[in-house]
Curated annotation (Swiss-Prot):
This is 3'-5' ssDNA/RNA exonuclease TatD. CDD domains: TatD_DNAse. It is found in: Cytoplasm. InterPro entries: DNase_TatD-rel_CS, Exonuc_TatD, Metal_Hydrolase, TatD-like, TatD-type_Hydrolase. It comes from Pantoea ananatis (strain LMG 20103). Belongs to the metallo-dependent hydrolases superfamily. TatD-type hydrolase family. TatD subfamily.
Length: 260
């Protein structure tokens, strides 16, 4: 099982980052993608991936929260990072109209620019969308024929939005959000709609600790080593064999990010 979304550059991991990676290995996590959310963190993510070759890879991008930071210098930084073999996707990029930490116009501009970069470099995109589906689709769709692959990370949208994403050819990342008995029930019921070859799993660590873990981790910090719990629950709710699903999501991740 491959974790496609780990915020390993987070300061929450500053004191034990190497142990976090070791625990993931021991738990059976077969690889992980370290998320870049701005120019600096994308550089840090690449360095971590380089230090753990053939187990960690990274993305290079600007999260919509940081879209106001977009500039020609940032674009050039991402371009240079994308030349490195450890960097396998452009992103995390997209739109977030929930928290609006950057203006909508800035978000759309940075999103479109990163899609253009991914198309130019023939790289997959690692996508973010929250409460912005209509504009997200409008910006994304013209680029899809020029992109080798795309995954919408941490999907939490509606059934209609899921159908639209699948119709666009996107793969879908599922996190521990689905384990939340308050917010995750609707998503749980949608799991069987995702074709097996389009399903990816992720922790989004250190965020989104699965609420149904027992005993509950005392730190309340999510880690990649908790991915087996998400896998087990998703397999249960999809009515699938756990081992087969583990192999499937690992294959899906490696295929999407060009690792096989």
């Amino acid at each position: 099982m491959f974790d496609i979304g780990v915020n390993l550059t987070s300061t929450q991991f500053a004191s034990d980052r190497e142990k976090v990676i070791s625990r993931a290995r021991e738990a059976g996590v077969t690889g992980m993608l370290i998320t870049g959310t701005n120019a600096l963190e994308s550089q840090q993510a690449q360095k971590l991936a380089e230090a753990h070759q053939d187990y960690c890879w990274s993305t290079a991008g600007v999260h919509p929260h940081h879209a106001s930071e977009w500039s020609a210098d940032v674009a050039n930084t991402l371009r240079r990072l994308a030349e490195k073999k450890d960097v396998v996707a452009i992103g995390e990029c997209g739109l977030d109209f929930n928290r609006n930490l950057s203006a909508h116009q800035q978000q759309e501009y940075a999103f479109d620019a990163q899609l253009a970069l991914a198309a130019e470099l023939n790289m997959p995109v690692f996508l973010h969308c929250r409460e912005a589906h209509e504009r997200f689709a409008a910006v994304l769709e013209p680029w899809l024929p020029k992109l080798p692959a795309a995954v919408i990370h941490c999907f939490t949208g509606t059934r209609e939005e899921l159908t639209a994403c699948l119709d666009m050819g996107l793969s879908v990342g599922i996190t521990g959000w689905v384990c939340d008995e308050r917010r995750g029930i609707a998503l749980r019921e949608m799991l069987p709609l995702i074709p097996a070859e389009r399903l990816l799993l992720e922790t989004d660590a250190p965020y989104l600790l699965p609420r149904d873990m027992r005993p509950r981790p005392t730190s309340r910090r999510n880690e990649p080593c908790f991915l087996p719990h998400i896998l087990q629950q998703v397999a249960n709710w999809r009515g699938e064999n756990v081992e087969m699903l583990a192999r499937q999501v690992d294959h899906n991740a490696r295929k999407l990010f060009g690792l096989i």
